[in-house]
Structure formats: structure tokens, C-alpha cells
Design a protein with these regions (language model features):
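A short beta-strand micro-motif common to beta-rich folds, especially ectodomain repeats
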Residues: 423-435
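Solvent-exposed, low-complexity, repeat-rich "mucin-like" stalks and linkers
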Residues: 350-394
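Short, exposed coil/turn segments at beta-strand boundaries within extracellular/luminal domains
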Residues: 434-443
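Conserved core positions of repeat-based scaffolds
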Residues: 39-42, 51, 109-112, 121-122, ...
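Short, solvent-exposed loop/linker segments at beta-strand-coil boundaries, enriched for Pro/Gly
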Residues: 396-410, 485-486
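Extracellular/luminal low-complexity segments enriched in Ser/Thr/Pro
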Residues: 411-424
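Short glycine/serine- and acidic-residue-enriched loop/turn motifs that recur at repeat junctions
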Residues: 1-15, 53-81, 122-161, 173-176, ...
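An edge-strand/N-cap motif at the start of beta-rich repeat modules
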Residues: 1-8, 15-18, 28-33, 311, ...
């Protein structure tokens, strides 16, 4: 049950704890979390997976596409408002899925990696994003018309099934031959309507919608089975160490820290000094220069993909952004779109001094010429707001909830979103320059409100469409943001005037 009070709309600007109970009625030991468009996943230390939120395409993997709640809520939207265990089919019988080591949620679909390197997917399958190939059959209700308005009679899968890859000589996808089940996978990421996986030999495969080149196999066609990503010369892309799938684009960090991207580039989000979409892995450059090797972005450790914005973290801790920059959402206080990676400048250049961060508060100097954008903070950053005004003068104290510290960036809608996991005692907020009206990022340390000498650690955080899921170092899961589809997992979606269910 939640341990904090929610806002009266049913959404919350402060973190609420999600109750995830195991078979023995003890709290499950959660080690990883993931967030899709309107659903969430949580992985336990024993390899099981829990899910909650929107379930109209079976993206929760529980064997149904209906509405369930501890309060027996019945309505038009299929959802689970509290966590449920993801199921598996074993000899035709439903059992709890097990031995999972990696999870990802994207759009209305989910993907899991088992310890033996096999991949299981479920949810919406209309563009091949589940990677079933010719093995997709109509059973367990994946075309069951729970409501024509909900599934539009499109294929979906309510129980995890194993994904397949196509033969390597079938890169054109014409009359493709299914080869084998996908194997030796170490990492998987589900995008909006496509998925990308990393094999233990450094090769990258993808499946699903490919009309913008987001599959990276050299063509702009969709596929219902995994195909191998190639580089700009048509050779198999190799030496990848991590991968990421976005809205209509994909990315991979190669050994040595080089960043490669492919897919939609209409907003310059590929960072290759152009606005032309790419169907093969293309290296990201710095600024507008591609004349020398030193002009390529290097030493990248983490990459995060939004709709039209890309953010990368360097080994030295610097943050690099590129893509659309409406109102300065790339964090550099200008209104210029970058076709190559641009480093977010030092915050003290703009006279913002956060040296006196303590006790969970940040004090902004009274002579600062900035205002805090509270619209962004209200739904994502979890601030303890003083009133409902859109903007507040920068001077004075601002409180952080103790569950919120992280490094984040701003997406195309001006919303704060995280860029990587494992961040310790850091939070990023947006501020608005009163002289130009452009927004930028400010990073500050955050300490425990009850112990001003102790920083707070959150090892993992994930953002959905307009909500956030955080895993604290003690294994507890906290959520905040929009809760219209039960994606916060707290047992209800609406509150009465007293803030109670």
C-alpha cells in the first residue's frame, strides 16, 4: 500500500511505494525495473517478473487482456492497478515465468531475457515488434477481440513466447526464412514499435517496425523476426557493448565508447551532422565537424533516446545532447537544433550556485535571474511544491523528496527524464533564463532530509510516457506521475476530495 498521500487528481507529484508481495506474503526482492508507455515491470532476484498498468494488448504477460484490481474496478480500460506475476506456458499449462535476467518495456509491448540467453516477448505485435516470425499462432487469446475498440483485431500476445531470428542471408526480408530461436542474448530493449537485442559476441539484432530505418539492417522495411544490424558500409555491426531503442530510432555504444545510431533523423536526433534518416549504424559526431577522427563523439558510457532528443553520458561525467531544441530543451539555454552532439555547459556559467545544498533543500541565490519551471517538476521530479503556480521566482528554498535524486535530461515535451542508472545523490532540474526565455539543465547534489551529511542513492530509475518508476537501494519500488491506467501500481487510479481512494 502507498505510504504517502497522493494529489487529488489521482496523479502524484511525490513518490508512492508500490507493494510487491511474493509467494510467502513477504515483499519481493526487486533488482530491476522498466517502464513502457503506460505499464511497468519489476524483476526479482529469483528471476520472476511482476507487471502493472495498462493491459489492453496483454503487455503485462499475465495471460489476460482485461481489467483487474484489488478493488475489483471495472471500466472501459483494461488494466491491473496492482502488480501481478508474469506467466509462462509450460507444456500447455500456465506457470510463473522464471530465470529472467533482463527486462524492458516500450510502447504497448514487453521483452524479457532469460539466463540461458533466450528472449521472450508479449503485448502488441502488429508491426512484428515481438519477433515471432511465422511462429505467431492464434492461441491463448492473442486475437481474441476483447473489444474491437481496444485491440482493433490486431495480433497481440498475453503470455510470453520465444522470439526468433531470420537467416543472415535474408536482409531484404523478401520471402524470409525463419532460422532459429534467438539465442545468446545479453541485453534487450523495447522501443515504441520495434525491439533491439545485443548478442554476447557483440552483434546487434532488431525486429518490428522499420519504415524509418530503425532496424538498422540496411533497408527501411518492417520484419516479424530478428535481423542483424549493419554498418554504413554494409558490414555486420560488431563490438557493441550496450543498446537502446527509442521511438523510431536505435543506438548502440561500441567497445571503446563510440556511439552509433540509426533510424528516424527528421529532428536531427541521430547526431551525424545531417537530418537524413539512416538504415544502418552511423557514428555520432561532435558539433558540425566530421573531418577528423577526433571530431567523433567518444568515451560514451550511456545513451538515452526520446522522441526527438538524444542524450549521452561521457566517462568524465559530461552530458551531451542533440536533436530538436525547442525552447532550449537540450539544456544549453539556446534555441538552436544540433545535428551533432553538443556538451551541456557548466551550470556555474549561468551564476547558479548550489554549493549550499543540504538537508534535502536547494537554495538558489536571490540575485539569480532564473525561474524554476514547476510544470516539469510537478509530475516528474517529485518536488514538494509550495503552490500551484506555473512559475516561481528563483530565490528561496525548494524541497526535494528523499526518493528523487538522479541525473536526468529534458525530452521534446520539456519533461525531465532520466539518462541512465546507477546515479548517486544527483538530481537535475530545469530552469528558465528570464532574459531569453530558454530552458536549461542544472545539476545538484541531494542529501537525506533527516541527515544532511548523507547522500541518497537510487540505483535504477525508468520513465514511461508521463510517469516515473524508481528502485531504491533498499529494494523498494516507488512511482509518481500520471496514474490514469494504473501505471503507478498503487491499487487505484482516482481519489476523492479528501485524497483517499
Amino acid at each position: 500500500m502507498p505510504t504517502v498521500q497522493l494529489g487529488r487528481t489521482g496523479s502524484t507529484s511525490v513518490a508512492a511505494e508500490v507493494s510487491i508481495v511474493g509467494d510467502t506474503d513477504d515483499s519481493a526482492n526487486i533488482i530491476a525495473i522498466a517502464a513502457g508507455k503506460e505499464h511497468s515491470l519489476a524483476l526479482t532476484s529469483d528471476g520472476r517478473v511482476y507487471a502493472w498498468g495498462l493491459n489492453n494488448y496483454g503487455q503485462l504477460g499475465h495471460g489476460t487482456s482485461g481489467t483487474h484490481s484489488v478493488y475489483n474496478y471495472t471500466g472501459d480500460v483494461a488494466r491491473y492497478e496492482t502488480p501481478v506475476i508474469i506467466m509462462d506456458l509450460n507444456n500447455g499449462k500456465e506457470t510463473q515465468i522464471h530465470s529472467i535476467v533482463s527486462i524492458s518495456a516500450g510502447g504497448d509491448s514487453s521483452i524479457l531475457v532469460r539466463g540461458d540467453g533466450t528472449v521472450f516477448t508479449f503485448g502488441k505485435a502488429d508491426n512484428g515488434q515481438l519477433g515471432y516470425g511465422e511462429n505467431l499462432t492464434v492461441n491463448d487469446g492473442e486475437k481474441d477481440n476483447i473489444s474491437d475498440s481496444k485491440v482493433n483485431s490486431t495480433y497481440h500476445k498475453t503470455i510470453p513466447s520465444q522470439a526468433v531470428n531470420r537467416s543472415d542471408d535474408d536482409t531484404t526480408l523478401a520471402g524470409g526464412i525463419i532460422n532459429t530461436y534467438l539465442q545468446n542474448v545479453t541485453e534487450a530493449d523495447m522501443g515504441s514499435e520495434h525491439a533491439v537485442v545485443l548478442i554476447n559476441n557483440g552483434f546487434v539484432y532488431s525486429t518490428g517496425l522499420g519504415t524509418s530505418g530503425q532496424l538498422g539492417n540496411g533497408v527501411s522495411d518492417s520484419t516479424d523476426g530478428y535481423v542483424r544490424v549493419v554498418d554504413s558500409e554494409g558490414n555486420y555491426f560488431e563490438n557493441a557493448v550496450n543498446i537502446s531503442a527509442g521511438y523510431n530510432q536505435s543506438a548502440s555504444v561500441a567497445k571503446g565508447g563510440a556511439l552509433y545510431m540509426w533510424g528516424d533523423n527528421s529532428s536531427k536526433q541521430l547526431g551525424d551532422d545531417s537530418a537524413t534518416s539512416k538504415s544502418s549504424a552511423t557514428r555520432v559526431v561532435k558539433g558540425h565537424n566530421i573531418h577528423e577522427t577526433s571530431d567523433y563523439l567518444s568515451n560514451v558510457t550511456t545513451v538515452s533516446l526520446g522522441n526527438t532528443v538524444t542524450t549521452a553520458i561521457n566517462t568524465d561525467g559530461t552530458v551531451w545532447t542533440f536533436g530538436t531544441n525547442v525552447s532550449g530543451v537540450l539544456g544549453d539555454f539556446v534555441n538552436y537544433d544540433y545535428t551533432g552532439a553538443h556538451m551541456v555547459g557548466p551550470v556555474d556559467y549561468y551564476a547558479l550556485n548550489f554549493d549550499n545544498v543540504e538537508g534535502g533543500h536547494i537554495r538558489i541565490p536571490e540575485d539569480s535571474t532564473f525561474t524554476l519551471d514547476e510544470i516539469n517538476l510537478k509530475y516528474v521530479a517529485g518536488f514538494n511544491l509550495h503552490d500551484d503556480s506555473d512559475f516561481r521566482d528563483a530565490s528561496g528554498d525548494y524541497s526535494f523528496e528523499s526518493s528523487d535524486p538522479r541525473i536526468a535530461t529534458v525530452d521534446s515535451n520539456g519533461t525531465i527524464t532520466p539518462i541512465g542508472n546507477g546515479n548517486y545523490g544527483k538530481v537535475t532540474i530545469t530552469v528558465t533564463d528570464n532574459n531569453t526565455g530558454y530552458r536549461g539543465l542544472v545539476v545538484a547534489d541531494v542529501y537525506n532530509v533527516s541527515d544532511r551529511y548523507t547522500k541518497i542513492a537510487i540505483p535504477m530509475i525508468a520513465s514511461g510516457l508521463d510517469f516515473t518508476v524508481a528502485l531504491k537501494s533498499d529494494g523498494s519500488v516507488w512511482t509518481w506521475g500520471n496514474n490514469s491506467s494504473g501505471q503507478l501500481g498503487i491499487g487505484y487510479t482516482t481519489l476523492d476530495a479528501d485524497g483517499k481512494d
